[in-house]
């Protein structure tokens, strides 16, 4: 069985995360939209780095903790927790080649442990109705899913 680990994001890990995103994800799956032609343009790569620096690495602007998802030492995605009152909002993305292999369930368990150790009372997440993989992971963890049209809101008590 492959070793799955969460590595705290720092500059070297961010470079590995960008490589994983470029190799195995569409930019719209892993970052806010950036104008221009589709694909991983130089501008989109720079925006990816700045997005993560601002949200996690810059102490003046950080709003979340982010980890690189490593499988056998190779970056394959990211996981994050953002404080939201007595809760933490969670997010995970995995490269296409890492989906459907049980990695998401193991990352979810690791992220839940991090959320519990943070002292949060609840874990929140959101996804789309069509994201069957995310929905299955969250339901498997015991979360309540509230579906409204194409939006799915998730809440899971942590105690």
Walk through the language-model features, giving the residues of each:
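GNAT-family acyltransferases
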Residues: 1-89, 95-96, 114, 146-158
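Conserved acetyl-CoA-binding loop-helix of GNAT-fold acetyltransferases
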Residues: 94, 100-117, 132-140
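Hydrophobic adenine-recognition pocket in adenosine-nucleotide-binding enzymes
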Residues: 94, 127, 143
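Proline- and acidic/polar-enriched loop/turn elements at helix boundaries
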Residues: 110, 127, 150-151
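Conserved GNAT acetyl-CoA-binding A-motif
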Residues: 115-127
